[in-house]
Structures are given as structure tokens and as C-alpha cells.
């Protein structure tokens, strides 16, 4: 336990220190998505995380016991997460329409791989790819309580995503492995 704590503490301190220093994901990255959340009324930002390649590289060097996680962290160029609380007076139907429009408006190199729509909520997962790799992943989701944007940038292969979690059912893991990228 203490050994694990000694490994985690330096990484946690780096996260705190570098988040204040502007070590963030670059908007010039091909997998970057600009979330224009300023256009939405009735939102209060709860969480905003932006981690760039320097911190991800440090984190990768400190993952000794999981080669899959280490390889994934080393391949990442940036991770951005924004979570907003939705106020009671916000127009939820309008927010859902905005999120749907934002997902649809991404350029033609972005491919929607998941769309879930239930009542007054919606979620989209999109990937941007080249012929060889996935360059970016974007998640846009809204429900009655929060609006969430996630953007993961880096050159990822479907096999990396397949190996990421043993919780992925076998059929979905096979779909990731054979996902066409061209």
C-alpha cells in the first residue's frame, strides 16, 4: 500500500502543479475538437481538465505494472474533459439539439461510432482517423443534470482500445480490432 502511494503521489503532485502551468493539449493536434460551450445558456462549469503530452509521458513512465496502460498513455497527445452542471432554467431540449448539431457538424474525417438517445438525453462517440490509426476520440453527452465533453488525442490503434479493458464484451472487442480506418 505504501509502495503504491509512493508511486502515485509524484504523479498526483505533477498533475496539480502542471495544470496551473498551462501544460495542456494543443489545439493544433489533428484529433482536437473545439467545443463551443460558450453558446449554451444555463450552464455552470463543474470540471475542466486538460492534460498535454508532457504530463501523459510522465504518467506513462510511472506505470510499471500494466504494459497496456503504459503503451496507451505513451500514444496519447492530450486529454480534455469539460463537465457542466445544467441549471433548472436551462432549455434542455435546446441543449440536446445543440449537442446533436455539434456532433453532426464535425468535419467528414470524424465518424460517429455510437449514438444513444433517450427521452431528454443524448450521447455521441466519434473518432477521427487516418488510414493507419485513430487520431482522436470525442464524446459529447447531455442529460437533465450535466453536459459533458471529452476529447482524447493521439495515434491509437483499434488493438490498443481492444486491449484497454477486459470489461469489453468479446463481440465488441472483435469489432474494435477489425474496425476499418480507411
Residue ranges and their predicted role:
Residues 1-10:
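Bacterial N-terminal signal peptides that target proteins for export
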Residues 17-20:
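C-terminal motif of bacterial Sec signal peptides marking the signal peptidase cleavage site
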Residues 22-25:
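Bacterial signal peptide processing site
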Residues 29-99:
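Early exported N-terminus immediately downstream of N-terminal targeting peptides
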Residues 44-46, 74-78, 108, 118-122, ...:
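Extracytoplasmic
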Residues 103-129, 175-181:
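Short Gly/Thr-rich strand-loop-strand
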Residues 126-161:
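A short, solvent-exposed beta-edge/loop patch
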Residues 154-182:
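C-terminal partner/receptor-binding element of secreted or periplasmic proteins
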